Structure formats: C-alpha cells, structure tokens
C-alpha cells in the first residue's frame, strides 16, 4: 500500500483485505505528516517502510514493488489505503491472474459507486475523465480509466 497521509482511512482499508488469500502486506509511508505510521504500526502490518523524504507516488510504488519482488510475491496487488478501491475485490481480481485468465487486472474508481462517491476530488475526476476520453480515442479502446493512481 503506497501511503501518504492515510491515517483516517488506513484502518478501514486494512480491515477489508481478504487475508484468506493475502499472505503479506507492505505499507510504504511516503513521509506522511499525519499519524499514518502510528496507525500502520498499531495494525501490525507485516512490512512497513518509511520514506524520510516524500518520493511522490511513483517513488512510493517503486519501493512497494521492490520489496514485493524481494519477498518473491506470486501476485502483487497495489491497493491504495484511501479506500477509493474496494479491498473486498482483491480475491476476484487475483483469481483472474492465478487462473491464467489475465496477466494483469486493473481496478477502476469510475465504475460501481463512482470515484467521487469514494472521495476523489472534483478537479481530479474532471481531468481523469478528459485524459481517459482522449486516450480512448487515440488508442481506439474503451477503458473506464487509464490513470488509476
């Protein structure tokens, strides 16, 4: 979980992870200024890394993936601790990979309850939709969202 100032939503997200199929949880705190690290420690998350300096979303993801590779993970799920993605869907999504249906499965904040209903700011939603429309036209695809982070 790439975390930045996620203290308010981390516990709810973590509680809904399906631990019957999830072996390890990695949380990388990207120099949060709130209580994210304390909440993570209280939850006894297996692997917690703290960045001393904010590395940004990309840097945070790289740290998550590097540790997942070191742990020799079979399937890696990048779950954001802000609950814009429902952790209860991990079993279904990972099953598609484990059963060789797909090599990659990408979640969408746009489908279902909707991104703004899950806390996405209006300006981010607007630009996400514009970029997705442009990319769908350019690439002749029909994805609900290209920018899932």
Q: Where are the language model's segments positioned?
A:
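Acceptor/aglycone-binding surface of glycosyltransferases and processive sugar-polymer synthases
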Residues: 51-53, 57-70, 87-149
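Short, structured coil segments at secondary-structure junctions
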Residues: 21, 43-45
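Short, well-formed alpha-helical segments that are part of the catalytic scaffolds
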Residues: 4-19
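Donor nucleotide-sugar binding loop of glycosyltransferases
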Residues: 6-9, 32, 86
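A conserved acidic beta->alpha catalytic loop
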Residues: 29-37
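Short beta-strand-to-loop acidic/aromatic patch adjacent to the donor-nucleotide binding site
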Residues: 73-84
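A short, conserved beta-strand element in the Rossmann-like catalytic core
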Residues: 31, 56, 84
